[in-house]
Amino acid sequence: MTLRLVFMGTPEFSVPTLRALAGAGHEITAIYTQPPRPAGRRGLELTRSPVHQAAEELDLYVRTPQSLKSEEEQQVFRELEADAAVVVAYGLLLPRAILEGTRLGAFNGHASLLPRWRGAAPIQRAIMAGDRETGMMVMKMDEGLDTGPIAMTEKIAIGPDMTAGELHDVMKLAGAGLMVAAIAALEQGELALTPQPATGVTYAKKIIKEETRVDWSRPAEEVHNHIRGLSPLPGAWCEMPAGDKAERVKLLRSTLSEGSGAPGEVIDEGLAIACGQGAVRLLELQRAGGKPVSAADFQRGSKLGRGTRLT
């Protein structure tokens, strides 16, 4: 026996779960994903989401509503007569009529150990906070922000130099396997739900551009966590001297280093940079419009000497 599912997701993070559920033999009655977005240099092309593209490869029915608030859209959803909805990084709020519009409810794959890091950016926030462990969770959704009871958990270690991009790729695969297991248990009537703890709640606010600049006055560990937590996107950045101008450069990889100096000062030609306490060594950088390069390759073109100040 298999379940009739509605899948709701948008970015690449969601795609492995969609493919895994389809591969497990479940009937995917519809895909909900965000509408195509303008792309290209002039924004004249419309680009379908990664989930939309995967759904078309799987020959699945796709819907791209701007909102799920209208009675008309909610009626369409109910008429799908799905057993359950699976939601992974969809990006739209689900009204009660949608949450209650299937026989068994809506189940969300969330990239944190709830109730820590409820919200939009749990992967980035966990690394930026210096967390050493995170995890994927499947929860049954309610009307709150990631407040529903927990069905399944898989813990994942965060390495000391792991970037958000690397953790994202580990978690999207873990989340796929976890959701398949949860839906199998749901199908058998064996999925147990546990309320979230009332303590330990934190919120993973969406990353905004105003917080992406590196503050070299902070301790080295905080700077390092900031760099790797924002890598590769949107990318932490600083300004470096470029002739008589300043050049904005993204910092994609770093590691903790020894040494001291004024905050932002280059303290050796291997791109160790002094922080408020300690130092970080830059390992990978990216100029505007360029490709990511190693620190050694970057230095061949820039030659940032000792005493140079980054801001």
From Swiss-Prot:
Organism: Chelativorans sp. (strain BNC1)
Encoding gene per record: fmt
E.C. designation(s): 2.1.2.9
InterPro entries assigned: Fmt, Formyl_trans_C, Formyl_trans_C_sf, Formyl_transf_N, Formyl_transf_N_sf, Formyl_transferase-like_C_sf, GART_AS, Met-tRNA-FMT_C
Protein name (database record): Methionyl-tRNA formyltransferase
Family assignment from sequence similarity: Belongs to the Fmt family.
Superkingdom of origin organism: Bacteria
Pfam families referenced in this protein's UniProt entry, alphabetically: Formyl_trans_C (PF02911), Formyl_trans_N (PF00551)
GO molecular function: methionyl-tRNA formyltransferase activity
Oxidoreductase as UniProt keyword: no
